[in-house]
Amino acid sequence: MDYRFGRQYRLLKTDDFSSVFAFRNRRSRDLLQVSRSNGNGLDHPRIGLVVGKKTAKRANERNYMKRVIRDWFRLNKNRLPPQDFVVRVHRKFDRSTAKQARAELAQLMFGNPATGCRKQA
């Protein structure tokens, strides 16, 4: 198992983010929203993160949320389809609610329609 999180697994350019948002394939829960593309032409998934200052004012809070999401992706990337994903944090979470954020991320990323995720056009 490869648990690294190298550059090839990240969305780095604005065009990469724009192409994912252009598909308008979004699902959201209480804390997170995940946009996904139909495919990226690669043999592995890639992820981009959006945590705005409106969500968390302090940089260390934003960094913690990104760290939790990156860690979940790093451990589960082998189970994901080769698509591009953009995860946007809607509401701030901390150590006490990180478990809920990980559970929501699993529901959103694996796209199980029985999980009650709200699909947005």
UniProtKB/Swiss-Prot annotation:
SUPFAM superfamilies: Ribosomal protein S5 domain 2-like
UniProt keywords, alphabetically: Endonuclease, Hydrolase, Nuclease, RNA-binding, tRNA processing
Superkingdom to which the source organism belongs: Bacteria
Alphabetical GO biological process terms: tRNA 5'-leader removal
EC number: 3.1.26.5
Pfam families per the UniProt record, alphabetical: Ribonuclease_P (PF00825)
Keyword hit for tRNA processing: yes
Gene Ontology, cellular component aspect: ribonuclease P complex
Top-level EC class as recorded in UniProt: hydrolase
Reactions this protein catalyses: Endonucleolytic cleavage of RNA, removing 5'-extranucleotides from tRNA precursor
One GO molecular-function entry: ribonuclease P activity
NCBIfam families per UniProt: rnpA
Family, as annotated: Belongs to the RnpA family.
Stated role: RNaseP catalyzes the removal of the 5'-leader sequence from pre-tRNA to produce the mature 5'-terminus. It can also cleave other RNA substrates such as 4.5S RNA. The protein component plays an auxiliary but essential role in vivo by binding to the 5'-leader sequence and broadening the substrate specificity of the ribozyme.
Entries under HAMAP family matching the protein: RNase_P
Protein name per its UniProtKB record: Ribonuclease P protein component
Organism: Neisseria meningitidis serogroup C / serotype 2a (strain ATCC 700532 / DSM 15464 / FAM18)
